[in-house]
Design a protein with these regions (language model features):
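Conserved beta-strand termini and adjacent loop/short-helix elements that scaffold enzyme active sites
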Residues: 6, 32-35, 112
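FMN-binding flavodoxin-like domain, especially the glycine-rich phosphate-binding loop
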Residues: 24-28, 49, 54-184
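Structural alpha-helical scaffold elements that stabilize or flank donor/cofactor-binding regions
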Residues: 40-41, 67
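N-terminal beta1-alpha1 ligand-phosphate binding loop
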Residues: 2-24
Length: 184
């Protein structure tokens, strides 16, 4: 099985998560691509797509790339500088899945906490200290906490999630069964 991981990263969090997933995969062939450096030809059995969340979904570069993908087994993962168990995080992952689900088979998804880039923090600070897109004391505290993400545990969980889904795909293929739709 050949797995290609393609990611877009602003602060380095998505790159770190992609690298951790890549390192953990035990497959015949695997390739890791930074979308900013190279737009790969997708010839693998599985494509894992990682992005940083911008405006509630994939960043612009990944969004444009996702629009070109067709007929693939796809996994989607993302990082954001907010709580991974929040509705915002789930919606951000669902937005990425929605971009690929009609033309591809979705194997699964994963959303992870990440740090906010310094440029984004500067924009929030320019908005003052009141409101959701400001440098409120609560936001400042969250940004400080998120500096430690993704953690090794989060990376391991993402790697486990996709390793499990690849195993499931192979099990089904051996039995000539279709991968069931996943509603993310």
């Amino acid at each position: 099985m050949k797995v290609q991981i393609v990611y877009s990263s602003l602060s380095g969090c998505t790159r770190r998560l992609a690298q951790g997933i890549f390192d953990a995969l035990n497959v015949d062939t695997k390739e890791l691509y930074d979308l900013a450096a190279h737009v790969p030809e997708l010839d693998g059995d599985v494509v894992l797509l990682g992005y940083w969340v911008d405006k509630g979904g994939p960043d612009a570069a990944m969004r444009a790339f996702m629009e070109t993908i067709e007929g693939k087994n796809v996994g989607v993962f993302c990082t954001l500088a907010y709580w991974a168990d929040s509705a915002h995080a789930h919606n951000a992952l669902a937005a990425g899945v929605a971009m690929v689900k009609d033309k591809n088979r979705v194997l699964g998804g994963y959303v992870c906490n990440g740090i906010m880039s310094q440029a984004m923090i500067a924009r929030f600070r320019a908005n003052g200290t009141v409101g959701p897109h400001s440098a409120s004391p609560a936001n400042e505290a969250r940004w400080e906490l998120m500096k430690n993400h993704p953690t090794d545990a989060e990376i391991a969980l993402a790697a486990e999630r996709f390793t499990e889904r690849l195993c499931f795909l192979q099990m089904l293929q051996k039995q000539n069964l279709e991968y069931p739709p996943i509603n993310i």
